[in-house]
Amino acid sequence: NNFLENIDRVEMDIEEMKVMKAEVKSIRAYNYFWLSFLWGDVPLVTKVLTVDEANSVFRDSKETVVNFIVTELQEAIRDLPVTRPNEDYGRITKGGALGILGRVFLAEKRWEEAKDTYKQIMNLGVYEIDPRFSDLFIEKGENSKEFLLVSKRTQDLYTNSIQLVCQGFTWGGWHHFSPYNELVEEFCCIDGLPIHESPLFDPEKPYENRDPRLLKTVFVDNVSVFKGILYIAHPDSNPSIYM
């Protein structure tokens, strides 16, 4: 809000200013998407508040917030570039803002609008599905043409304990996060059918004939290998636990 209220005071190229405004609007809309998605009615603040104003805000309806998000993104999309030069990698593009907008429509079950939005991304001609699924989450996958939005990181610079929180105890971590079984069940069989429909699914061998991305997404007890070590769940855990 502070940026948008003051950027017009800066002497700079008008076209560059339009792009920067679009970036900030996209980021603000993205934040409001998650607020409304998680909490429903939330205060919609679009200006810099005084202390008194901040202490007296009230929640706006989710419908109002979602309408704001959609309008902001649609305005931003018009001014964002399709691609960026290498030195600007990580800054939001037209495809990134369209991706956020499509996600909003999916969350709101506005299926046709979501479909039309994702079709616009496809028509940009700059994105493609990357077959290197595992690499998308490590340094090797940086600059993949599958990415719509990226959050850049500095290699080997640890400013918090997230690595320990996520890793299993076998590798010195705390294993605080585990996926739900519902996520595992969402991976279809190799015939493209859900597990409750596919004749290939065997509940006695639930990881066979499954979408290969499954075992690249979750660690399975006595199945997955990481850094040359077999993953074995903690003896006190549920025997079907995932990581």
Stretch-by-stretch model annotation:
Residues 1-39, 54-67, 73-87, 203, ...:
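Conserved, well-structured interaction surfaces
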Residues 8, 36-44, 49, 84-85, ...:
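Short coil/turn linking the two alpha-helices of tandem helical-hairpin repeats
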Residues 8, 50, 61, 93, ...:
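Short, solvent-exposed coil/turn linker segments
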Residues 28, 33-35, 46-48, 133, ...:
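Glycine-rich, histidine-containing beta strand-loop boundary motifs that form or position
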Residues 42, 74-80, 91-238:
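An aromatic- and glycine-enriched ligand-binding surface/loop that stacks and positions planar moieties
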Residues 52-54, 233-242:
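Short, solvent-exposed loop/beta-turn-alpha elements that line the ligand-binding surface or hinge
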Residues 69, 214, 240-242:
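Intrinsically disordered, low-complexity repeat and linker tracts
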